[in-house]
């Protein structure tokens, strides 16, 4: 077999493939063995028709499509290996010659991975972020812990304040008619949380348990239920209970309740400071890397094929659906709730998809330019991390990857990570 690659404009080209006649005849034999099981010829049992009789009645051409189905995938894959091109979409195949006793000749119009013209990627600047943790930061974190440990206590004869939780019944009406989903009993609503329509919670401030009120609001214009969007509504509300947060004392006992590993409030404060310092250092490092990656990709010149963007959109849509499933939803439910279509969702994601593709192509080009590769030892360490994370043995993790085509994906990801590390090592901090 021979293969010739001819580059056209943009990211397209034509792959001309010539497959020897022996391979064609071999594929025709396989095709006959498959097809003969399905044909009926008078005087012969199904599957027992001689080849010559079959060709006399149906013609050898009846085998061509099945033979092509056998030949093309293998020949196309071999041609890609021979020419070293990197297709990013399905090819358009044009059969130029296909007949018994002769070579198969076909042309494949292929969209390939684009060439990347790197711009500046060494010496890129990033803003040094202050990661200092102050005493006030620690106190704020301590206050948040105190808030989370607070108990809701019913307050008798006291009016609702901001931050209180009201236990209430409500029923909503638009144009004097009750609407679906507008009614609840014994609903707990934290005042100021913004759970309800703007203006609803504010009008409950000052009410006491046992009191009733008509709350007048207007649904937002962008409200998800179109039949209610922009319309004024009246909610009949009855307050059952008013609950207020009762904060625990900030003392050693509180510290031990929050964290079993500490014995005093001072120890807890020290631990909180260390965690804040670690978190801020991690956040600063993430921002630095993100800044450098974005600058390097913006400096590169790339003509990105639409096919690569569409593939990334498919991946992003799948990731989005997985997040929805974690919340007990699926795409169909999301579209119904949001009023969006799949086309609108993809259009909304398209800019981010293009950025992702641009970033990956840029980092891959930097890795190639700087001869950065992931070693077998790097892959082994990554597998060990995965084994620890999922509490499995390394051999089990390897077996899983073996069923999925091996660890080439890990090696490619590590190569990209080395490119990011390279950007960091060759960057400049500015204040």
Swiss-Prot record:
GO terms for biological process: 'de novo' cotranslational protein folding; cell division; chaperone-mediated protein folding; protein transport; protein unfolding. Signal peptide: none annotated. Its main location: cytoplasm. GO terms for molecular function: peptidyl-prolyl cis-trans isomerase activity; protein folding chaperone; ribosome binding. It comes from the Bacteria. It is found in: Cytoplasm. The keyword Cell cycle applies. Involved in protein export. Acts as a chaperone by maintaining the newly synthesized protein in an open conformation. Functions as a peptidyl-prolyl cis-trans isomerase. This is Trigger factor. It comes from Halalkalibacterium halodurans (strain ATCC BAA-125 / DSM 18197 / FERM 7344 / JCM 9153 / C-125) (Bacillus halodurans).
């Amino acid at each position: 077999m021979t293969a010739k690659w001819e580059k056209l404009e943009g990211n397209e080209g034509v792959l001309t493939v010539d497959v020897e006649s022996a391979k064609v005849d071999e594929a025709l034999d396989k095709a006959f063995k498959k097809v003969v099981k399905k044909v009926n010829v008078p005087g012969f049992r199904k599957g027992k028709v001689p080849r010559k009789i079959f060709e006399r009645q149906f013609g050898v051409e009846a085998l061509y499509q099945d033979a092509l189905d056998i030949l093309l995938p293998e020949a196309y894959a071999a041609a890609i290996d021979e020419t070293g091109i990197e297709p990013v979409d399905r090819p358009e195949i044009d059969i130029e010659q296909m007949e018994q006793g002769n070579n198969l000749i076909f042309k494949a119009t292929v969209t390939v991975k684009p060439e990347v013209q790197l711009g500046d990627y060494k010496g890129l600047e990033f803003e040094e972020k202050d990661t200092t943790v102050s005493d006030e930061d620690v106190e704020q974190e301590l206050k948040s812990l105190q808030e989370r440990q607070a108990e809701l206590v019913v307050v008798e004869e006291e009016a609702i304040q901001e931050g209180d939780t009201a236990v209430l019944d409500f029923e909503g009406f638009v144009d004097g008619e009750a609407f679906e989903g507008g009614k609840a009993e014994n609903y707990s609503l934290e005042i100021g949380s913004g759970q309800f329509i703007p203006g609803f919670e504010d009008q409950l401030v000052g009410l006491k348990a046992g009191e009733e009120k008509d709350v007048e609001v207007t649904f937002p214009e962008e409200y998800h239920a179109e039949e209610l969007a922009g319309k004024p509504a009246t909610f009949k509300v009855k307050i059952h209970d008013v609950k207020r947060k009762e904060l625990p004392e900030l003392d050693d006992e509180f510290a031990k309740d929050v964290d079993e590993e500490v014995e005093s409030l001072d120890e807890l404060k020290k631990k909180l400071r260390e965690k804040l310092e670690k978190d801020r250092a991690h956040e600063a490092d993430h921002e630095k890397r993100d800044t450098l990656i974005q600058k390097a990709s913006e400096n590169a010149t790339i003509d990105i094929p639409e096919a690569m963007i569409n593939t990334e959109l498919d991946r992003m849509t799948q990731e989005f659906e997985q997040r929805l499933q974690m919340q007990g939803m699926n795409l169909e439910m999301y579209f119904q709730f949001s009023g969006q279509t799949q086309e609108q969702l993809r259009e909304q994601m398209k800019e981010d998809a293009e950025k992702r593709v641009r970033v990956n192509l840029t980092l891959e080009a930097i890795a190639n330019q700087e001869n950065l590769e992931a070693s077998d030892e790097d892959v082994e360490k990554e597998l060990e991390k995965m084994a620890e994370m999922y509490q499995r043995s390394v051999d089990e993790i390897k077996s899983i990857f073996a069923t999925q085509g091996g660890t080439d994906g890990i090696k490619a990801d590590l190569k990209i990570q080395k490119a990011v590390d390279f950007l960091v090592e060759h960057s400049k901090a500015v204040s």
